Regions:
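Alpha-helix-loop-beta-strand connector modules within alpha/beta enzyme cores
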Residues: 16-40, 83-104, 146-165
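Glycine-rich, proline-tolerant flexible connector loops at the mouths of alpha/beta enzymes
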Residues: 2-25, 71-81, 132-147, 151
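Glycine-rich anion/phosphate-binding loops
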Residues: 43-57, 80-84
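Hydrophobic faces of well-ordered beta-strands that scaffold small-molecule active sites
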Residues: 5-9, 37-41, 66-68, 101-105, ...
Length: 181
């Protein structure tokens, strides 16, 4: 019998801002099946009040694991919201709840970052802000993952780093993920 440590429940891609389904699915996974869930929480366009409401809800249903992300920038985004970077959201969650905060990392580099060195610097900000572990976003080359972990160690990023796994069902899915990550 498969007994995963957790099931990750995505928030949506492409700038989706409604996470009610995410929270309900995570609640069902934990309540009905007894499997820990990790909810994705993206900060794009959210205020501190919005996030506090979400944190209180998650605490109330016993969900302790949050993958804190900036999220995809939606078309027409006006720059609103209190969180410009994932590290800002991580810090806020850390200061306002008792959660296992997970940060995203990018072994092949974040698509918007101009260098892998700056990418590692940004990752260090996430850990310093309160991320207790990291999970990778899409990568294709295992050597990049191993090299990335070594660079993290050298940068004094000493939290667990897990390779994110997503079942691939078609080529279109791979191409879409490659443009988002």
């Amino acid at each position: 019998e498969i007994q995963p440590d957790f099931i990750s429940v995505t928030y949506g891609a492409g700038g989706t801002t409604n996470n009610n389904k995410t929270f309900k699915i995570a609640e069902t996974i934990k309540g009905k099946y007894g499997i820990e869930s990790v909810v994705h929480l993206t900060s794009i366009g959210l205020t501190k009040t919005d996030v506090l409401e979400k944190l209180h809800y998650l605490e109330g249903v016993g969900i302790k694991n949050i993958l804190a992300l900036r999220g995809d920038i939606p078309e027409g985004y006006d720059g609103s919201g209190d969180f410009k970077h994932a590290s800002d959201l991580i810090n806020f969650i850390h200061e306002n709840g008792n959660f296992n905060i997970i940060g995203a990392c990018y072994p092949e580099g974040h698509i918007e970052c101009e260098s892998k060195i700056k990418d590692i610097h940004n990752l260090k900000k996430k850990v310093d802000a309160g991320a207790k572990q990291l999970i990778t976003q899409l990568f294709f080359n295992n050597d990049d993952f191993y090299s990335f972990r070594e660079k993290c160690h050298l940068a004094d990023i000493n939290v667990p780093i897990e390779a994110g796994i997503m079942p691939v069902t078609n080529t279109k899915q791979i191409n879409r993920m490659a443009t988002l990550c």
